[in-house]
């Protein structure tokens, strides 16, 4: 089992660096600041995504988005944002930030190996967000993204004394023939909840400009 895939699956919220067919709806920013916990209705306790991957025998090799030969994966860089390199972030992860701090966007790609149902896998992609401290759900979707199985969740949570707003999308695309390799692509955008409204234009530009397509 390659550790990179499972470590990254749980790292996005912890690092705070961190369409949609119809595009995400405008968040209710007032509700972002509240700490009243809300979680999606479910009959079972959420299984952390990393645990689900491990239990399903799925392994993955990290690949830099710009090194893919059979898939196009990219996000735009809004004015005032720049690429960020940090020792605690894998070099294969593309990270951009505004003025070198929050808000941030993190883009990760993994080449997958294992026998799994992509449509079922993405159903577990939102679990980690719902398990965050005082998580409040704003929006979620299980609709395909550019024709590929996908899940999206948006909400706010507490971390290290701060209230954060997060948008997280997981996509399981298939590369072009002949290999038709399957990948896990994750985009996470994180901002301070109190700055979510002022930063909305930049964040929406990243979300709407997120591209996943076979070459």
Spans of model-derived segments:
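Solvent-exposed loop/turn segments at secondary-structure junctions
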Residues: 113-114, 157-160, 191-195
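Signature of long, low-cysteine stretches enriched in small and polar/charged residues
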Residues: 126-174, 178
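Active-site-flanking beta-strand signature of metal-NTP-handling nucleotidyl enzymes
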Residues: 106, 185-187
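Short hydrophobic/glycine-rich mini-motifs in sensory/regulatory modules
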Residues: 178-185
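A short acidic-to-branched-hydrophobic micro-motif
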Residues: 93-122
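N-terminal targeting sequences that direct proteins away from the cytosol to non-cytosolic compartments
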Residues: 1-92, 179, 190-215
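Extracytoplasmic
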Residues: 68-72, 100-104, 148-150
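Extracytoplasmic/periplasmic mature domains of Sec-exported, cell-envelope-associated bacterial proteins
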Residues: 87, 91, 104, 163-165
